[in-house]
């Protein structure tokens, strides 16, 4: 176990990092319930003062297991930039959902000033990287479900779930953008 360590980092720090998703990882398969559970957990969490300290409590996701890598260790077709910093060993479903939430918030609320988004690169599902970057809510306020391949289908369904969840909470006057 020499050389291994556990580091707790805020999600905001993850947004500046690049992740490589190796071939052994299954495709994205989170369901509507799983996406909504994560959204509700984040939204309902409220930081509280820690007694005797200036610190506040913080929301803790289930872990992402990563391994630092050198870009020369990884061969990804058509990769011309984006230095890869970490191999994502476990937590790809969570990382992808965090990406989708951040991408949605950027698209719908941030305007011209975009916050950083996770960089996800796939060893074997090359088109998934571009698909993630190009997700959007249409002018008709709907998310098109792409069933051209199974990964696109589940990713677009998750994005649709995020859009429906935010739209519903907005209509009820309960959406708190600052929680994201």
Labelled PLM ranges:
Residues 1-180:
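Glycine- and hydrophobic-rich flexible loops that cap the catalytic core of alpha/beta enzyme folds
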């Amino acid at each position: 176990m020499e050389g291994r360590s556990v580091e707790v980092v805020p999600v905001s720090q993850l947004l500046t990092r690049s992740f490589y998703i190796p071939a052994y990882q299954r495709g994205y398969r989170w369901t509507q319930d799983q996406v909504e559970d994560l959204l509700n957990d984040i939204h309902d969490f409220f930081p509280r003062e820690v007694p005797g300290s200036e610190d506040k409590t913080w929301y803790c996701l289930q872990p992402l297991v990563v391994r630092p890598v050198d870009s020369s260790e990884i061969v990804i077709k058509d990769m011309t930039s984006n230095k890869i910093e970490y191999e994502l060993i476990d937590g790809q479903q969570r990382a992808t959902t965090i990406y989708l939430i951040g991408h949605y918030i950027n698209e719908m609320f941030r305007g011209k000033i975009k916050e950083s988004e996770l960089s996800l690169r796939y060893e074997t599902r090359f088109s998934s990287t571009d698909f993630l970057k190009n997700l959007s809510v249409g002018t008709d306020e709907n998310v098109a479900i792409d069933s051209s391949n199974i990964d696109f289908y589940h990713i677009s369904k998750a994005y649709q779930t995020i859009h429906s969840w935010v739209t519903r909470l907005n209509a009820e006057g309960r959406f708190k953008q600052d929680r994201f």
